[in-house]
Amino acid sequence: METFLFTSESVNEGHPDKLCDQISDAVLDACLEQDPDSKVACETCTKTNMVMVFGEITTKATVDYEKIVRDTCRSIGFVSDDVGLDADNCKVLVNIEQQSPDIAQGVHGHLTKRPEEIGAGDQGHMFGYATDETPEFMPLSHVLATKLGARLTEVRKNGTCPWLRPDGKTQVTVEYYNENGAMVPVRVHTVVISTQHDETVTNDQIAADLKEHVIKPVIPEKYLDERTIFHLNPSGRFVIGGPHGDAGLTGRKIIIDTYGGWGAHGGGAFSGKDPTKVDRSGAYIVRQAAKSIVANGLARRCIVQVSYAIGVPEPLSVFVDTYGTGKIPDKEILKIVKENFDFRPGMIAINLDLKRGGSGRFLKTAAYGHFGRDDPDFTWEVVKPLKWEKAAN
């Protein structure tokens, strides 16, 4: 059996780039909660003792940006300088302007266009991917790396590993077998965890605790064997972390947000963007399309691409590839996709209920992945029943 290795990485919510994603989406939530028609393009950057929120926002909502920044930092665990940032005493800078009137008239006609007339907020192309290798219809390498990161945060916050600090990264290499275009995981080859820690803990205890409390509960035993390699805090020291260790920016973890290097990516980030931004809404609808194709048994693995021009409602192109795993020809599947999914941005927003913010709806997406999550707020994960005729043998 010929196999190959494929690797995916993740970072947890205390990583500076992810902190920025979460602040940007917390701002989006606050705007949409009060005004579902808010137009939001919110970027965040951070470095030692400083967070800056900037971008273009047109909204009827009253938003306390500084409070959102401090609350988000605090809930992640950035409560003192020694963990990387002090939520209550850091500098918060805000530079928010209105959406450009040129963009506003072209996309939504200053809010006068009907939903089916709303144009894409920009040009671009987005990809959706799905695979039958996990119950989530997501790549195993990505699922495991993401779950390790989430588990790191869980054992920090519940006190299981009190030496943990917010920042951390994970990486998983899986050995795969290619079964006529479908991906079959064989075993976990390598696990890397680098986590921020306090001064008191030894490297031996870090390794022991990570194996017992993080790796064991996350990675199914059947994938681990005596040859699995573990690199646990391989640098030997990771006390300085968060924005103190590295600068952070919104939109710098787009592969972690999506499919862990599988499929493809059009380059557009998600966080801090309202649904007229097709970087986000377009990527969500093609995930639903790809997942529905696989979940309905049309294919074992699938990628869907959609593309847009600014101000134009209809997509310019839709592409489907099932990597040779389709039960019917790809051109038939493409027809089914076009019949069952409305790719116009205004209709995506309605069909996936993307104008509804508040209660941390988009904030939740900003750490541990936008796809493969079992949560009713992740409306794009709902599988649509697709009608199709099995090819006669």
Curated annotation (Swiss-Prot):
Binding residue positions for Mg(2+): E9
Gene3D superfamilies given in the database record: 3.30.300.10
GO CC annotations, alphabetized: cytoplasm
Residues reported in the UniProt entry to bind L-methionine: E56, Q99, D246, K277
Cofactor(s) this protein requires: Mn(2+); Mg(2+); Co(2+); K(+)
Reaction(s) the record says it catalyses: L-methionine + ATP + H2O = S-adenosyl-L-methionine + phosphate + diphosphate
GO biological processes: one-carbon metabolic process; S-adenosylmethionine biosynthetic process
Pathway in which the depicted protein is active: Amino-acid biosynthesis; S-adenosyl-L-methionine biosynthesis; S-adenosyl-L-methionine from L-methionine: step 1/1
A Pfam family this chain is assigned to: S-AdoMet_synt_C
Activity as a function of temperature: Optimum temperature is 37-45 degrees Celsius.
pH profile: Optimum pH is 7-8.3.
UniProt entry keywords in alphabetical sequence: ATP-binding, Cobalt, Cytoplasm, Magnesium, Manganese, Metal-binding, Nucleotide-binding, One-carbon metabolism, Potassium, Transferase
Keyword Cytoplasm: yes
GO MF assignments: ATP binding; metal ion binding; methionine adenosyltransferase activity
Tissue specificity field: Mostly expressed in roots, and, to a lower extent, in hypocotyls and cotyledons.
Its EC number(s): 2.5.1.6
Activity regulation text: Inhibited by products of SAMS reaction (SAM, Pi, PPi), substrate analogs (cycloleucine and ethionine), and alternative nucleotides (GTP, CTP and ADP). Strongly repressed by PPPi.
Induction pattern: Strongly induced by elicitors from Phytophthora megasperma. Transiently activated by salt stress,.
Binding site for ATP: H15, D167, G168, K169, S235, G236, R237, F238, D246, R252, K253, A269, K273, K277
Subunit structure: Homotetramer.
Family: Belongs to the AdoMet synthase family.
Entry protein name: S-adenosylmethionine synthase 1
